[in-house]
Amino acid sequence: EQLICVTQLDRIKIQFAARGVQRIQHDGHDAFRVRLPDVILRLQRREYFRLTAPSAHSLTCLIPVTIDGESREVSVEANVLDISGGGLAITVPSDGLVVAPDMEFPNCRLMLPETGAIVTSLRVRNLFRVTNRDGSVTLRAGCEFTQLSGNMAATIQRYILKIERERNARERTR
């Protein structure tokens, strides 16, 4: 017999087949002992690595919206939840921004620390209601970068790599 084990690590699905399963006691608790798997699958359906936005310095995106029947434009600030080379996810602000799938927002300004503004258009690809720990409900919008120049894409990739290197260095010192 074999047991299929599935888990997630950093939002990446990990799966393996466990053979030779034995029920044992470990530190006074029931547990399973298995042979090391021959193969471990890491399943990530992404073209780009996704970085959860650092809590040390929050990322924001300024989204221009037209109000007063197209006579005036204001920028609505949205908190960035995660970012990749292909797009980002934001918490939709409770006021000032109406969002629906396939909506496009031109001339958005992604504010990266130490880098400045990345100007791009965003297309909303998906929307999810998220229930927070305190019971409040927010809307999460997954957005794709459109009309992103090569230089701006490279800047985003450098930022992601820098933050990931810093996180890995902190993990190693623990």
Per-range role (PLM):
Residues 1-174:
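Structured alpha-helical
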